């Protein structure tokens, strides 16, 4: 078997190794983030590689980053409570309005493959207030949200890692991630997934997501999760 790196467009365009996820429907097909190709090539090249590997009897596992998004297209005003990055249990201030880059409209893709757009309501935390750039080392918990349960207990709660942290408790988020997974299986033919940064995502989410994909595929999928501990 062969584990291939994240194949979709990241915030760094052709230089992004894939973990700064911008658009999971762009496998090197659209002019976004100043590049059509990803670091690993075009969509056509990726699909050809997967096809040839499978023809040779080699299973292919796709690196999959479900934890966060980065490189939003629009800033959105929202309210949030600040926490120190090293302490997710005790707020360091009261809720206030911030300006967060949480609007993902993917103008370069223009609705091809999916019309879903991300907004602040689909995330639970960010780490930068563009109206207050001097405030660093801060995690902003968005209004009405909570840090995911069933995650690593480092820093009291290690649900937040980077970028715009997906709110897996939001039904639209779960539906969209399942929709993307089905699309990815149909379009690439991969045999399974390597799930990135699972200690930052609620453990209860994965059985639901995998069940939806395996029902769609009509078979068991090989899945392994990355859980990094210092």
Which residue ranges define each predicted feature?
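Aromatic-lined carbohydrate-binding/catalytic grooves of carbohydrate-active enzymes
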Residues: 2-40, 58, 209
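Short, solvent-exposed turn/loop segments enriched in Gly/Ser/Thr/Pro and often Arg
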Residues: 3-14, 64-73, 197-202, 225-229
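Active-site-proximal helices and loops of the catalytic beta/alpha 8
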Residues: 6, 19, 49-54, 58, ...
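Substrate-binding cleft of carbohydrate-active enzyme catalytic domains
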Residues: 38-72
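Active-site-adjacent "subsite" loops/lids of carbohydrate-active enzymes
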Residues: 81-82, 88, 142-182, 187, ...
């Amino acid at each position: 078997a062969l584990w291939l790196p994240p194949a979709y467009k990241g915030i760094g365009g052709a230089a992004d190794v894939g973990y700064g996820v911008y658009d999971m429907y762009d496998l090197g097909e659209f002019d976004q983030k100043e590049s059509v190709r990803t670091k690993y090539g075009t969509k056509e090249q990726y699909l050809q590689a997967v096809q040839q590997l499978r023809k040779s009897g080699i299973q292919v596992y796709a690196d999959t980053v479900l934890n966060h998004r980065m490189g939003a297209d629009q800033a959105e005003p929202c309210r949030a409570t600040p926490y120190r990055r090293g302490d997710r249990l005790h707020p360091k201030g009261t809720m206030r309005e911030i300006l967060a880059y949480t609007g993902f409209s993917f103008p370069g893709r223009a609705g091809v493959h999916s019309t879903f757009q991300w907004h602040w309501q689909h995330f639970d935390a960010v780490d930068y207030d563009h109206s207050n750039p001097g405030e660093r080392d801060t995690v902003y918990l968005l209004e009405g949200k909570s840090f995911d349960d069933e995650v690593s207990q480092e820093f009291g709660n290690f649900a937040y890692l980077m970028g715009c942290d997906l709110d897996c408790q939001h039904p639209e988020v779960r539906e969209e991630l399942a929709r993307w997974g089905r699309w990815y299986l149909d379009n690439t033919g991969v045999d399974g997934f390597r799930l990135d940064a699972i200690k930052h995502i609620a453990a209860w989410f994965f059985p639901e997501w995998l069940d939806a994909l395996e029902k769609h595929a009509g078979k068991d999928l090989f899945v392994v999760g990355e859980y990094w501990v210092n």
